[in-house]
């Protein structure tokens, strides 16, 4: 074995040991990040198993099997959530490196295109990780991880201070996606919702102004004033535009 082969062998051996140690750390950390099934998930599993009770022969063994499957389900969910955290951590570290002055401002975005099928999945994982590490306690981190994926991603991506997001986490724990999103829309509305509200308020103000102008116009027309052909044409155009819109 030549020198190059020896160096390669040592490198791969160290790399395997490092991967093995990382894997052990990650597996043990799954327990730390494990989450209980919420009431909706429990009920869904109960409904699933309810249809099987007609062939039941051993009640005690059956209940043990149900509990085992529920435990496995919660462990799978814990592994999935741990996967999102690990993914988010790697993206976070890559962004830190690629934001250095020696790289262009588009390098990180181009890197995401190379690595991920869709950028949205990468940004979801990144936002999830950033919110997770910003939470001030392990209890809050576990509560955040107990929230369904869609709700957690939405919460992480919404603009708002940490205090508000912590408050939202406490309120939506144990809720279904639909219920949690409704609460978030009230306490932490999206930028689009805020824009829609601004447009609505703008329309209200414009309608108020229009009302004043129309009332004044009616007053002038009803006063018997002689209308010039030009003004008659403008009124005709106004009526035609209104008919087209309505």
Swiss-Prot record:
Domain of life, per lineage: Bacteria
Pfam families attached to this UniProt entry: UPF0137 (PF03677)
InterPro entries: UPF0137
Keywords: Plasmid
Stated family: Belongs to the UPF0137 (pGP6-D) family.
The name this protein goes by in its record: Virulence plasmid protein pGP6-D
UniProt source species: Chlamydia muridarum (strain MoPn / Nigg)
């Amino acid at each position: 074995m030549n020198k190059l082969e020896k160096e390669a062998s040592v490198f791969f051996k160290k790399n395997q040991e490092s991967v093995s140690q990382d894997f052990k750390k990650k597996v043990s950390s799954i327990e730390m990040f494990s989450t209980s099934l919420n009431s909706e998930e429990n009920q869904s599993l109960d409904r699933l198993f309810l249809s099987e009770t007609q062939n039941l022969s051993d009640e005690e063994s059956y209940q043990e099997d149900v509990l085992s499957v529920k435990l496995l389900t919660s462990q799978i969910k814990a592994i999935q959530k741990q996967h999102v955290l690990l993914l988010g951590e790697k993206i976070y570290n890559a962004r830190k490196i690629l934001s250095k002055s020696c790289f262009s401002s588009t390098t990180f975005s181009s890197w995401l295109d190379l690595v991920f099928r869709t950028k949205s999945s990468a940004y979801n994982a990144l936002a999830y990780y950033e919110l997770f590490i910003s939470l001030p306690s392990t209890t809050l981190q576990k509560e955040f991880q107990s929230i369904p994926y869609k709700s957690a991603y939405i919460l992480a991506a919404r603009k708002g201070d940490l205090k508000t997001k912590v408050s939202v986490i406490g309120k939506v724990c144990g809720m279904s996606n639909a219920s949690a999103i409704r609460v978030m829309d009230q306490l932490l509305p999206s930028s689009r919702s805020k824009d829609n509200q601004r447009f609505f308020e703008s329309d209200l103000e414009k309608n108020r102004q229009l009302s004043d102008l129309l009332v004044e116009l009616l007053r002038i027309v009803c006063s018997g004033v002689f209308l010039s052909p030009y003004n008659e044409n403008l009124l005709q155009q106004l009526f035609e535009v209104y008919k087209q819109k309505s």
